[in-house]
Amino acid sequence: MSTDHIRRPIRRALISVYDKTGLVDLAQGLTAAGVEIVSTGSTAKTIASKGIPVTRVEELTGFPEVLDGRVKTLHPRVHAGLLADLRNPEHEAALAELGVEAFELVVVNLYPFSQTVESGASVDECVEQIDIGGPSMVRAAAKNHPSVAVVTDPQGYDGVLAAVRSGGFTFAERKKLASLAFQHTAEYDIAVASWMQSTVAPEQPETDFPRWFGRNWRRQAMLRYGENPHQQAALYADPGAWPGLAQAEQLHGKEMSYNNFTDADAAWRAAFDHEQKCVAIIKHANPCGIAISEVSVADAHRKAHACDPLSAYGGVIACNTEVSPEMAEYVSTIFTEVIVAPAYAPAALDQLTKKKNIRVLVASEPQDGGAELRPISGGLLMQQRDQLDAAGDNPANWILATGSPADPATLTDLVFAWRSCRAVKSNAIVIVADGATIGVGMGQVNRVDAARLAVERGGERVNGAVAASDAFFPFPDGLETLTAAGVKAIVHPGGSVRDEEVTAAAAKAGITLYLTGSRHFVH
């Protein structure tokens, strides 16, 4: 027979909190219900200042707070009262023999360690905010949840008073509270351990990858479904991470879906790969078009959309600058799932919100430093994020393999094409003219098919354009597909055993060919 519904009356509570939010109301409610309160330091002082009866913990232990408050509750007369399993007659007998009374309720929140670190405090100041007694009490009470209820969040105080009035928490409720308490201390320990590892005692391994790493992920939202309707999905975020797309503010539209987030993330990164005003339009995590402009964001959007208008229908748009009214007016004529930008002109927002279904997001500029994680069966892959910072991403380091050096306008397009490759699933060929993609061949299992696809999509516009390949041409055929369509300059990493054949094909076609020495696979 289940005992989950059985309530345990609350007669005695231990309260020790850094965050005093709601403390007085809680203490008044407990006292009115006949609950004895034992408390520590500033918590006891706050309670007593309102004329509420409180027993200071040093009265209970017979031992004063010492070492600037580092030792307050670490005492057998406290922890015996927390850990005694009142279902066990031997534990009850031991308490009686020791003259120790049990606690049925523990209310504790911890020193603000993470906030102290974020404030830029010194190492010594941060160390002082590593709570010891608080987590010990929380863990003890959570372990002993058959006998004790533990609350770590001031938002739970109304529930405490409601439970007291109802005869105490049920066993089911105490189990839930214990689970939340262990999550709370786990998050705290991960924050401390991560800071110690990165700041106090940084590892000096053979690589930049730590032996251990921890992250705190909290569910931000349940999503309608996953990639497909039969898959459930949710959005999680790390509260300590730099704000990104997961923390974006939605200004308009229905709730985001799993696919909306994956496409928006790809678009957001693609737009910020370029310093000029840039717009990226993404569908199924691949670009329908990317364009830059020195004139206006509306010009960049028109050029990006012109790359592949058919595929852009129902796509996701991202731009790296404020959305103008002119751009918003054009966007509003096209079915668009999501638009994300760092800001919107008021008139632009008014225009976009007239469309019922478009989701309008404002997000902080992506901070791409750090690691990229990918789950695999039984494990996790970690790599440095591709930030377009390899030596070959600087055109000053490119090697001219054949042909005449590119003029400034052609070189600008080659650099744009090369940087755009990072946003395209491999194998990738990107054809560019006048700061805009005009043909994108993506996700092909051989490079010549990627070239054919890019040429097909570019059509007549390919004549006189430039192209980039995210990895080397293993055979001349991919390059020859591009030159036959009229491409006048190409950039690729080089490094194939057939580089000489590829370069010879470029020379025969009379084009300019650059080698970067770096590649940009995306899987």
Curated annotation (Swiss-Prot):
Provenance organism: Mycobacterium ulcerans (strain Agy99)
Domain notes: The IMP cyclohydrolase activity resides in the N-terminal region.
Domain of life: Bacteria
Listed transmembrane segments: none
InterPro entries in the cross-refs: AICAR_Tfase_dup_dom_sf, Cytidine_deaminase-like, MGS-like_dom, MGS-like_dom_sf, PurH-like
Coiled-coil parts of chain: none
GO BP term (any one): 'de novo' IMP biosynthetic process
Annotated metabolic or biological route of this protein: Purine metabolism; IMP biosynthesis via de novo pathway; 5-formamido-1-(5-phospho-D-ribosyl)imidazole-4-carboxamide from 5-amino-1-(5-phospho-D-ribosyl)imidazole-4-carboxamide (10-formyl THF route): step 1/1; Purine metabolism; IMP biosynthesis via de novo pathway; IMP from 5-formamido-1-(5-phospho-D-ribosyl)imidazole-4-carboxamide: step 1/1
SMART domains per record: AICARFT_IMPCHas (SM00798), MGS (SM00851)
Keywords recorded for this protein, A-Z: Hydrolase, Multifunctional enzyme, Purine biosynthesis, Transferase
Any one Gene Ontology cellular component term annotated for this protein: cytosol
Protein's name in the database: Bifunctional purine biosynthesis protein PurH
Single GO molecular function: IMP cyclohydrolase activity
Pfam families in UniProt: AICARFT_IMPCHas, MGS
Family, per entry: Belongs to the PurH family.
UniProt catalytic activity: (6R)-10-formyltetrahydrofolate + 5-amino-1-(5-phospho-beta-D-ribosyl)imidazole-4-carboxamide = 5-formamido-1-(5-phospho-D-ribosyl)imidazole-4-carboxamide + (6S)-5,6,7,8-tetrahydrofolate; IMP + H2O = 5-formamido-1-(5-phospho-D-ribosyl)imidazole-4-carboxamide
EC assignment: 2.1.2.3, 3.5.4.10
Domain MGS-like: 4-152
